[in-house]
Amino acid sequence: MMLIRVLANLLILQLSYAQKSSELVIGGDECNINEHRFLVALYDFWSGDFLCGGTLINQEYVLTAAHCKTRNMYIYLGMHNKSVQFDDEQRRYPKKKYFFRCRNNFTRWDKDIMLIRLNRPVRNSAHIAPLSLPSSPPTVGSVCRVMGWGTITSPNETLPDVPRCANINLFNYTVCHGVFPWLPARSRILCAGVLQGGIDTCKRDSGGPLICNGQFQGIVSWGPKPCAQPRKPALYTKVFDHLDWIQSIIAGNTTVTCPP
């Protein structure tokens, strides 16, 4: 009887810690200065407000979330600290934005993806290098890396100068469907997070990468509010299922056939 009571008290302490963590920590620790050379920052042209993250996939293209779209934007590459500029930082503008319009076997939740062609190529440097597209699909159970300049508190926003990085877990889609039952029964979207809470992507992390086993597998799409709640993972657009579309556009075919 005493053992049961002790275990119950430990469980209560564990849950209360997870709930406090979800209020205090979002997005993990500051990223290492050398681990995010592909991470870009999208800004509103007129207000100068930071909007979203994105991923450089070659010298001319950036991949981000479709809901990050705005009529006029500019893109910073090679940035680490918003308040301290590197000599090799580069600024580009969208030449063309591409959106995934296919409907076959894709729900509206699966299509939060935008491919941006830059107005001129980017030069690789000490703080700038592209991240390759995935060569294989992600595996449930993988530990994945997320990063971004998104808010580190929720629901109120506190935006950091330096991007935060964190490790989260990739779950079966059924986990997210159980949390958000209004989602379609089947979806291509990825479900990832930390079930204990306390670590999560949040507002303005949108568009940034989900990197699993060294491969660019997801794009930050959306999640619960407030962020980092226990047992409430977030959702990520699955890059692998859009490979044909991405590669066809890069090759110059803008009237691509929808993938199966």
UniProtKB/Swiss-Prot annotation:
Pro-peptide region(s): 19-24
Keywords assigned by UniProt, alphabetized: Blood coagulation cascade activating toxin, Disulfide bond, Glycoprotein, Hemostasis impairing toxin, Hydrolase, Protease, Secreted, Serine protease, Signal, Toxin, Zymogen
Regulation (activators, inhibitors): Its activity is inhibited by diisopropylfluorophosphate (DFP) and PMSF, whereas EDTA has no effect on it.
MF annotations from Gene Ontology: serine-type endopeptidase activity; toxin activity
Subcellular location, record wording: Secreted
Family to which this protein belongs: Belongs to the peptidase S1 family. Snake venom subfamily.
Active site residues according to the UniProt entry: 67, 112, 206
Broad EC category: hydrolase
GO biological process: proteolysis
Protein name: Thrombin-like enzyme stejnobin
Glycosylation sites: 81, 105, 156, 172, 253
Function summary: Thrombin-like snake venom serine protease that has fibrinogen-clotting activity (FGA or FGB).
Subunit structure: Monomer.
Annotated signal peptide: 1-18
